[in-house]
Structures are given as C-alpha cells and as structure tokens.
A protein has these predicted regions:
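General beta-strand structural signal in soluble alpha/beta enzymes
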Residues: 41, 117-122, 169, 195
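Short, structured surface patches at the beginning of a domain
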Residues: 51-52, 67-80
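Short active-site oxyanion
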Residues: 33-39, 114-118, 166-167
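A contiguous loop/helix-start segment that scaffolds small-molecule binding in enzyme catalytic cores
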Residues: 9, 87, 166, 173-286
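Conserved helicase motor
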Residues: 64-72, 146-149
Length: 286
C-alpha cells in the first residue's frame, strides 16, 4: 500500500521509525510523513532514506535537523512554524521519539504553548528487548545510557540496585565489557541479565545468563551493533512465606486485595501474580 497524503490538523506529530528493518513502520506513520508541512529529524539523512524506501515524495518540503547540539537554537524557529498553523512531523534517528531522544524539550514546549502534540506509535528498542530478552516484563525501569566513567557508572548502578523491576539500559559496543564488569561487581555476579544487540536486523542476537557469565562472554568476544541490556530485579529468594504473609496482612488492613498485592510485590520484588494469589487466599480464609 502506498502512503497517501491526508488532512492533518495543525500541531506536532511524533513519528516512531524503524530500529532496524525498514518495513517495521506503521501505515499511519507513513501517511503522516507524506502529509506534514515540515519534516523535522534527529538525522535528516536517515529520514530521507526511509522516505525514499517507502516511496514518499518530499516535494518542496523542508527537512530540518533537530538534535542535541542544535535544539536550543532550533526550537524558537519550530515554535514559529507551529504558530503559523503548520503541521510538523518529528522523527528520531530510530525508534520512538522521547525515548533517549532529543525531542523532549520540543514536545514539552509545544504542549506548554497550547499546540496539539500527537504520537504515531511504533518501534522501540526498549520494548523489543523486553519482548525477546527472557526477563520479567511486569515492571521495568529504563535508565538510558550509564555514565562513561567506571566510578560514576558504579554509583548509578547502586542507585538502581533496589528498584523492584527489570532494569533496561542502552550501551555502546565499546563500553559493554566494562559495563558488565561493573554491573557484576555492584549488583552481584548471580543476577540474570540479557544483552540484546542488532534488534530486528540480520545479525540480531540475544545473549542470556548471569552477569558473571555475560562478563566472561564480553571479555572473549567483541560485540558489535546497537545494544540494549536487561538486568533482572533484585532477587527475592530470601522472602519466606511467613514474612510475605505478614507484609500482606499489614497491607490488607487499609487496601484492597489488588492494591495490597501491587504494594507488596513492588516492595519485595516478587512476581505480582504470586503475591496476588497469596493475598486472595488470605482474604478468602478470613
């Protein structure tokens, strides 16, 4: 199906683009790219190539660069275009805008000024990694890129150590080995993790194991491509049934079964389903 020009209401359209395979884009996203008055991109070459692949004519339209290095200078100009009643389509270099992406300040300013901000959802490396990584997805925390320096990286990992959900990071091939070493040291060598690289591309690979095992793999291999790292939540194996029952009993004094299960699962790191089943049984036994 060829993209078609459609009538768009004035505003800012945040368009998710493929993270690897060019066909991983929605029909709606293609229609928006075919119809917007002005195209804005983190990487103009990537957007132009995507449009060429899908047969979207650029015509006389502008393709304006908006990235970390020029955002402060470009925002007033883009806000001026919105003020004129134009439609702007913004695309990340890859994936969903706002996720480790420079478009946040633009979207926030547009919304604060009263302009319509619309999402055309689609690919995301975070969600794709969670889908194939083999770690719990009921709760997760996306932390973006860790600091480059080992000391700062360890400090950040300590802050994340107690978060009751799967940790999600972006990392570069040059730093993945050092990150794994620091994560094993700070979070413990036995925590399970996954390294997901080149997602949706020809050489997609998911490496699973403990942090210690993955540290060894990274020391022996030179991993290439874009990388997402998943690390499981802190182990809850030391939570005994009696302790869990006590926590649930306290929570149930002022909460519904569902809310109590949510609160205790978040506190202990246990799977919500397991906690909910126990809470339900306790409620029925009363």
């Amino acid at each position: 199906m060829n993209p078609k020009a459609i009538k768009l209401n004035p505003g800012l359209y945040l368009v998710a683009t493929p993270i690897g395979t060019a066909r991983d884009i929605t029909l709606r996203a293609l229609d928006i790219l075919a119809s917007a008055d002005v195209l804005v991109a983190e990487d103009t070459r990537t957007l132009r190539k995507l449009m060429e692949i899908h047969g979207i004519p650029l015509g006389e339209r502008q393709v304006m660069a908006y990235h970390d290095h020029n955002g402060a200078q470009m925002r007033p100009r883009l806000m001026g275009l919105l003020e004129q009643g134009l439609t702007l389509a913004y695309a990340s270099e890859a994936g969903t805008p706002m996720i480790a992406d420079p478009g946040f300040d633009l979207a926030r300013e547009a919304r604060a000024a009263g302009y319509t901000v619309v999402a055309a959802p689609g690919p995301s490396a975070v969600v794709t990694a969670l889908t194939v990584g083999g770690l719990p997805t009921d709760r997760f925390f996306f932390a973006g890129f860790l600091p480059n320096a080992s000391g700062q990286r360890k400090t950040a990992l300590r802050r994340y150590a107690e978060i009751p959900g799967t940790l999600v990071f972006y990392e570069s091939p040059k730093r993945i080995a050092a990150m794994m070493r620091d994560a094993a040291e700070v979070l413990g060598p036995d925590r399970r993790a996954a390294i997901c690289r080149e997602l949706t591309k020809k050489f997609e690979e998911v490496l699973g194991g403990t942090l210690a095992e993955l540290t060894t793999i990274c020391a022996d291999r030179s991993l290439k491509g874009e990388i997402v790292v998943l690390i499981e939540r802190k182990s809850s194996e030391n939570i005994h049934d009696s302790d869990l029952e006590t926590l649930l009993r306290e929570a149930l004094t002022g909460m519904t079964v569902r809310d109590a299960a949510d609160a205790v699962a978040a506190r202990t790191g246990l799977a919500r389903r397991q906690v909910y089943q126990m809470a339900l049984k306790m409620e029925q036994d009363e």
